[in-house]
A protein has these predicted regions:
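Generic structural signal for well-ordered alpha-helical scaffold segments
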Residues: 18-26, 49, 53, 86-90, ...
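Gly/serine-rich nucleotide phosphate-binding loop at the start of the catalytic core
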Residues: 10-11, 39-43
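Glycine-rich loop at the start of a catalytic domain that most often binds anionic cofactors/ligands
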Residues: 42-56, 78
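Glycine-rich beta-strand-to-loop/alpha-helix junction loops that act as flexible
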Residues: 35-40, 157-161
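Ligand-binding beta-strand-loop-alpha-helix segment within the catalytic cores
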Residues: 1, 57-154
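Short glycine-rich or small-residue beta-strand-to-loop segments that form or flank ligand, phosphate
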Residues: 32-36, 65-68
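Class I SAM-dependent methyltransferase SAM-binding "motif I" and its flanking Rossmann-like core
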Residues: 166-174
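N-terminal glycine-/serine-/threonine-rich phosphate-binding loop
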Residues: 1-33, 50, 100, 114-116, ...
């Protein structure tokens, strides 16, 4: 069930979101949390880190699943979403890497600029179809992982100024 909260400012939003996550983890210490990246949740992650450092939050049994990852960046790249999450939350709450999940981009697609040739006149070639197949398989595997975890107990999303969620822009089909 979705709930909406109207708050005064970013700081209050961060506090409210952190309080909701804190409550979920308190009620279910092995919660599966869906997390997002970007500027919106940074304040929330900072609040959770403060709760952890104060000894009020135990995250040792939670599992996290992130919305997305960049195609073309390795997991260790400083601009990857894994790096973002380690810096902004995981390291601050002592969360082990084996309890965090991201879409696994096939290694052979790690440098997409070399693997995705331009199409001519919108005609797809075999390489593009191979890449689409590999990405569809990545999505299928991530869906399977989410099902095996029983879905998410709580999903944190940021909505951009233009209404985008993740890389889904207004007008995109789901």
């Amino acid at each position: 069930m979705s709930r909406f909260y109207l708050v005064k400012n970013y700081e209050k939003m961060s506090e409210k979101a952190a309080a909701l996550l804190f409550a979920q983890i308190t009620l279910k210490p092995d919660a599966v949390l869906g997390l997002a990246t970007g500027s919106t949740p940074v304040g929330t992650y900072r609040k959770l880190t403060e709760l952890y450092r104060a000894g009020r939050l135990d995250c040792s049994h939670i599992t996290t699943v992130n919305l997305d990852e960049y195609l073309g960046l390795s997991a260790g790249h400083p601009q990857s979403y894994r790096s973002f999450m380690r810096k902004n939350l995981f390291d601050g709450i002592g969360l082990s890497a084996d309890r965090t999940f991201f879409p696994e981009i096939p290694e052979r697609l790690s440098d997409c600029r070399k693997n995705i040739p331009p199409s001519i006149g919108g005609i797809r070639n075999e390489t593009n179809q191979d890449i689409e197949t590999a990405l569809a398989e990545t999505c299928r595997q991530y869906d399977e992982l989410l099902r095996s975890l029983g879905g998410t107990d709580l999903q944190l999303l940021g909505i951009g100024r233009n209404g985008h969620i993740g890389f889904k822009e207004p007008g995109d089909t789901f």
